[in-house]
Amino acid sequence: MKRFMAIVSYDGTNFCGFQVQKDVRTVQGMFEQALERILKQRVITIAAGRTDTGVHANGQIVCFDCYLDIDEESMKNAMNANLPDDIYVRKVVEVDKNFHPRFDAKRRIYHYLIYNSQEPNLFIRNYAWWFPYKLNICKMREAAKFFEGEHDFRSFMKSGDHRENTVRTIYRVRVLQLRGGIILIRVEGRSFLRRMVRNMVGALVKVGVGEWKPEDISRVLELKDRSKAAVTAPPHGLYLYAVDF
């Protein structure tokens, strides 16, 4: 028996998130159906992260066991032949039988795209958050520094989530001005709470429009109260960019 790790990209627009659910279209559901056609048996997959409805991925990691005598390139080709056109397997690698994509991950990198322009761009409306009000990039960069390091991110978790351990370590947050009015927010950390990155982006935008000062990020972190933080940024601007092991 082999264990394969697949590096997967997908357009999350027409998926109800990654995790398999009954009677709705999910990335994991499509992935497992493709594997079952190839392997002729039920297959359970494990991923590095569970993206929400509308969230995209460039480098999601999906792991599964295979009883066929098949090489990596042949498995990649077989999977892409059986997957819909909004999922693409970029690479397949054989890994140790004890490898676990969630627990062995050392770093997860998320990208969030904002289209900062007075006029919308219809061709990227599913792939970036259109924000028509001017954003102060320098202030957003200053604010981003307050997220770095180990903090209790209870103020930036999903509302209604009652998990006890909400302490997370953020390695780096970068705010980059790209061409064409695109702002890229890059967040790196080992693990994240649900909606955490989108809530962080919402806070940075609040700083960008001048409603908060950069140091208000630190104040809200200390409050440990989701109701005191900013609104959640929409899902379609978020990408699981890469996972490092």
Curated annotation (Swiss-Prot):
Keywords: Isomerase, tRNA processing. The keyword Iron-sulfur does not apply. It comes from Pseudothermotoga lettingae (strain ATCC BAA-301 / DSM 14385 / NBRC 107922 / TMO). It comes from the Bacteria. SUPFAM superfamilies: Pseudouridine synthase. HAMAP family: TruA. The active site is at D52 (nucleophile). Homodimer. InterPro entries: PsdUridine_synth_cat_dom_sf (IPR020103), PsdUridine_synth_TruA (IPR001406), PsdUridine_synth_TruA_a/b_dom (IPR020097), PsdUridine_synth_TruA_C (IPR020095), TruA/RsuA/RluB/E/F_N (IPR020094). Its EC number is 5.4.99.12. This is tRNA pseudouridine synthase A. The gene is truA. Formation of pseudouridine at positions 38, 39 and 40 in the anticodon stem and loop of transfer RNAs. It is an enzyme of class 5 (isomerase). It catalyses: uridine(38/39/40) in tRNA = pseudouridine(38/39/40) in tRNA. It holds the Pfam family PseudoU_synth_1. Transmembrane segments: none annotated. Substrate binds at Y110. GO terms for molecular function: RNA binding; tRNA pseudouridine(38-40) synthase activity. GO terms for biological process: tRNA pseudouridine synthesis. Belongs to the tRNA pseudouridine synthase TruA family.
